[in-house]
Amino acid sequence: MIWRLLAAFYPDRPPDEIQRKERCLKETEDMFAPVVTAMYIRDKGVEASEQIVQQVDMMVDIMKDAFKHNLPKLSWMSAFSLSAAQEKLEHMVDLIGYPKSVLNSTWLDTFFARAEIDATDYLSNVVTQRSFSRHKEILQFFETYNRGLWNDFAHMPDIAYVNAYYNQLSNIMVVPIGMLQPPLFWVKPKSLTFGAFGIVVAHEITHAFDDEGILYDQYGTFNPLYDNKTIDEFHLASNCVRNQYSDFEVLTGVRVDGNITLGENIADHGGLKIAEIAYHEWLKSNGRSDSQLPAVDFTHEQLFYLGYALPWCAVHSDNMMRTHIVKDEHAPDKFRVLGPLANSPRFSEAWNCPIGSVMNPESKCKIW
């Protein structure tokens, strides 16, 4: 019995002191996620954070509007499926930034009233954390569900992290406060922001309509969104993306799995297409006026694509890449840039890529 208790509540202890500190820090952040979020917001400035959230809220509306106006242009979508997709987009809830409750000290004290922490007893704290989390989960069964609030996400540790996500089961997109900073979100120029942050938002919107998203309706209920003909046409169009990524060689003899990464690749392609449309419309409505970066001679469109590529700059070891290919549903960073851009006529035009070149192939994949 004691062994079962230890196995359930006492994780493997890292032998290295630095690793132990990292684990303790991570578990503390997970336990006190609302507190960490509040600390992060106050460090950035509450007023400044609110202003950025307002700007992001407007940008999300621009992205959703671009997606909405692009839907009727999809040749593979029937009239019935078009109506269903528009309805799902209309019902999508956006949670931007952070829940205001985390800045209320009284609320925080009440929320953590049951959590008794002992600075000298790690095992006791692990048990407390598991018990506390389970208690909160049980309480949710007796609460009235409101899809428009942060209830399902406010206590998660990644609100202050750089990670937007879409929840299929509730049709909710979360854009946490941690994302609202460079190299994703820039005050100016807007080209960089639309290219980096705008594509992330559009990527998450597209998840509502990828190979998994089409299995759920506007309320997040397991109910196929499209009719059978549209689903067949969608999968036919998706085959091009599947084959494209399956040809990408990460290391000698090691290729991207076009099946495992399909959903994310579809979202990447859709995100780029929608962000391109949104920035083009924004430029047009602002008389093609946008800020420029000093000392570099790039057009607005070129900066847009540089903004897209910038967050994916990374160097990985061969061993990490082999692990990534097996365990991650995302393509490696490099191919999340090259794949979508090679299918973009606007990119080829902006950078004058010759027809038939690697970044401007004559045959391009087109889903969105």
Regions found by a protein language model. Give the residues of each.
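Intrinsically disordered, low-complexity linker/terminal regions across diverse proteins
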Residues: 33, 37-368
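A cross-family structural signal marking well-folded subdomains
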Residues: 1-58
